[in-house]
């Protein structure tokens, strides 16, 4: 972890440019996921409402942690979990015990000799529950929907026999908390649980089991009890009979229900997606492998809930679950999944731009218990999408361009300048991120008034604390749209991200500050996500805000601001404007020269004289700017109704020494109109584009058969790229793989080939990235249509194969520019 959440260079305004301290490894966790490290309160201890650990600010965290740990058999998540072959599991058998516990089986006793949960991926249960893609042998079902099982009995089932199914989760299962579920066969259970005999044939009994639509999600132990005139029998617990229960967007009684099949296919079942980055004018996109069905990922998701002891009784509520996930995907407070790092120094971990998916990250966390270095907003969001989709919540990854970060709850973005309109960086704690990525997940909100169901924002990037914890959401998108910042959770912060105003303050001669300009359309200018059933970009800005400048939009802003720390900010507005300013930057590729320009337009009927000042600096995508490396001053005369353009060329050699992550630059433009006193102010962010990787499939792809992909890359820079690392990942195609390829010369073209063995049929995506100290944010993707294996059900039995990390690969060929 970093020195402190506000010490990260590139993340918070006003920080010196210094390398981060290297995080010390967390202590190895115990097998149940708890850390050996003593001291400090756990996540749920800080968040619960019990008398011994209550925090007055912690009312938002839901149920008390009354499910104690420490006795009984646990059904917590095992590491690393079972492998994912699709071979038919044998019927589990056990000797069982009678009511006396002595193991004696009496004549006439109804003994359960075996159980078949019909858990194969090709069986009816998995297909009907839309869980057949999970690379697991265990039964995985969605709550509120029936499933079938077969019992192999010692004799014919009689009407006088009584059979009871039991599901248990946690170390201290209790009926009253829903952690011990008792289901009498043939009788109505409580809370929607019931079991019925479908068919009795000889010693075989076919049962249909109905789960509650409000059931706790997680991995349950399963047992069967029988009672007959000859005595009672209990089937012993068998790990092969553990049952995973997930949220169910297909069940109308589940509060996560989604009433559109195409939405469910996209937001629950799609294993890959697009994440957008860059600037509004220069949008980049990268394909992300969510991999929610990959072997081990479901165990990793449940391990996240276990890691800091989320009460099992609260795991049936998607509001609580999503809020915990938003806290645990980042490492602050609770040693969660990812360590955030915005410094530019990633020498002790992985550059956030190098990740191509969530699988490698989650499996590393599950395997070691250590937080994974490093992540930034799109990585946190990508992992959150994986976790929530895996658990059954319809979730999408959302990008907000020109995303504000309000640090003082004013609900405005305050930017301070000196008397000459030069930015005062030590005062500019608020920042506008070029883009910020979070998540929407779909659920009803019974904890809110009516009208706030549907999409809810969840943000795992650690920006500000909520109830003392670095987490954010779930927050109703509808409350954001209408400026209802008093609705929980964290609505003021998210509203400011999408719909605050940019307020420019100038220092006066007496040291005070005066508002000289308010930019009303600068924040949340475009909010996008991947479209359903395509790789196109969908504009969802209208869901978050009313049309810019409309009465409804202004009312929402002013309503929100009235609840902020500067409720009277709109009482002091600047003078009328008659000179307009437009800022542009030439679209350029990393390594090329570029041009920036400012257009001035005189809308008045009089001559105007404008003193213009341009400051150019590099900037982190978080809005934190570096040193100003070029500036230009010019006085422009404008005739009535005339316009003029001021340009500033920038050579590669001028910006190269100053480049930071994302290749972004910030142009601060300020001006003063001599005749009217009008102040002009504008901040314009742009980025240098990076090249893509070119991927080509060599031959047909068939389940279980080796095929090959070719990757081609041309270095756009005139300098050598050192310590180049490729990453390759694709659900159903390739477990996460790291390829160390050494150096690539300036303007050199390289080609490499990699083989892989598909394990699941259907359309798949193979994703690759390149990273080096000199160049990052380079990635590529190829669609791979995998044919089923001849004469097979389609699945290959090596789905749980190991990842290939740290392999050194020779180049297939090299070429010059």
UniProtKB/Swiss-Prot annotation:
Cite the residue spans of the region called Disordered. Answer: 1-38, 59-105, 793-817
Describe cofactor binding as the record notes it.
Binds 1 Ca(2+) ion per subunit.
Residues modified as Phosphothreonine are 22
Highest taxon above the source species: Eukaryota
Q: Which cofactor does it need?
A: Ca(2+)
Residue ranges annotated as compositionally biased, kind Low complexity, are 71-84
Top EC class, one word = transferase
Q: Which InterPro entries match?
A: Ig-like_fold, Ig_E-set, Papain-like_cys_pep_sf, Transglutaminase, Transglutaminase-like, Transglutaminase-like_sf, Transglutaminase_animal, Transglutaminase_AS
The entry marks the following residues as binding Ca(2+), namely 499, 501, 548, 553
Phosphoserine modifications at: 24, 68, 82, 85, 92, 95
**Modification comment:** Palmitoylated. The membrane anchorage region possesses a cluster of five cysteines within which fatty acid(s) may become thioester-linked. It is subject to phorbol ester-stimulated phosphorylation and is hypersensitive to proteolysis, which releases the enzyme in a soluble form.
* Segments of this protein annotated with the region Membrane anchorage region: 1-100
Q: State the annotated membrane topology for this chain.
A: Lipid-anchor
State the EC number(s): 2.3.2.13
Locate the active site.
377, 436, 459
Compartments it resides in? Membrane
The GO terms this record gives for MF are:
identical protein binding; metal ion binding; protein-glutamine gamma-glutamyltransferase activity
| One BP annotation, GO | peptide cross-linking
Swapping residue 307 to W leads to an effect described as: In ARCI1; skin phenotype consistent with lamellar ichthyosis
Taking the first listed entry, what is the main subcellular location of this protein, grouped into a coarse class?
membrane
Associated pathology? Ichthyosis, congenital, autosomal recessive 1: A form of autosomal recessive congenital ichthyosis, a disorder of keratinization with abnormal differentiation and desquamation of the epidermis, resulting in abnormal skin scaling over the whole body. The main skin phenotypes are lamellar ichthyosis (LI) and non-bullous congenital ichthyosiform erythroderma (NCIE), although phenotypic overlap within the same patient or among patients from the same family can occur.
* Quaternary organization: Interacts with PLAAT4.
As for what it does, the entry says: Catalyzes the cross-linking of proteins and the conjugation of polyamines to proteins. Responsible for cross-linking epidermal proteins during formation of the stratum corneum. Involved in cell proliferation.
Q: Which family does it belong to?
A: Belongs to the transglutaminase superfamily. Transglutaminase family.
Q: Per its record, how is this protein called by name?
A: Protein-glutamine gamma-glutamyltransferase K
Native source organism of the sequence: Homo sapiens (Human)
